[in-house]
Amino acid sequence: QRRFGGVENWINYSDDPQIKSAFKRIVSKVEGKPASIDKGRVLRVKNNDQFLFKDNVLKYIDENPEVDFYLFFPPYHRLKHVMWKKYDPSQYEIYKNRVESIVSLAENYNNVQVFGYDNFSFVDDISIYKDTGHYHPKINSLILQWMKNGDGELKPDMLQSYFNEVDKKINEYDLQNIIDLIKHKLEKDDI
């Protein structure tokens, strides 16, 4: 709980090895050379993802046609998407392929719904994240309510619009302010 509250709070707990490591990774990516898409890596991961999804998820869906399955992609903080798109574009393509593949495969089942929330505004609120991947537990209740209402459901014909919204939010995100705070903390602590 102590790390929720935004980057300033993360900085207050930068003695935490996980936070320290994340800060160093972020700064090294920003200061590194721009990366390009590794199409081989993207394809390998895509093929593996499809195999894993079929073997570990669809298997149970096939075995339980009377059960309704609600699947969702965890809503990472926008900073993670920004870092992927700008500094690890292969990972961003992997993310998009993963969403597309699962939504497409799920479309063949009447008892499966897939949801995504990366286009929702709460993903921009860093205060509800203890790092870029772990949101406050209260978000789980919101996600369940949204799923119940059908909010955020993804269908193949909606994906282009969904990714356009996500990309727009990524492009509008103020990364520099966070980078400056992190660099200042790292320089101050001589990390």
Region roles according to the model:
Residues 99-191:
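C-terminal regions of proteins
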